Amino acid sequence: MKPAEPLTFELPDEESEDAGAERFSAKYHAREEELRTSFPTRALALLLQVLHEAGAIFNASVDQHDGEIADGDRGPKGPRGEVPSYKLCSNEGWHVTRDEAAVMHDRLTSFLDRGPAIEAGGNRFELRVDAADPDDRNALQWLRQLAVFFAAAARLHGFEVW
């Protein structure tokens, strides 16, 4: 996955402001659709909401490792470039390969497909689970542990994380 390119728009001199606004709107919505289809947005929103409601405070940054890697930086699994991965820098510091990320996504998708209710309003997602269900409790604990990874991935894909 490549980092999101910033959305830029220049209004040609000969174009009216209305026509320019329409072109910008179309370009913006195309970019929004690209983000939706290139990343498990629903899963991401769920994770961030779980964390937000738990009152968790986290801070993460991400360097993307995807074949084209700068010289001189080594990760826990050897020289950069050996293992295509995301290297996440948090207080604990951990390293997630693409295979591990795929497993995370599969598990999360399975959790979502089991049917916890998700209500969306604006940019807010609310998760409702059965607190008496050990599977739901375990899934929530697991989601919290993955929060730093998904927050960093969100930033990589142009989402605002707060």
Model-derived segments and their meaning:
Residues M1-W162:
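Acidic (Asp/Glu-rich) sequence patches and key acidic residues
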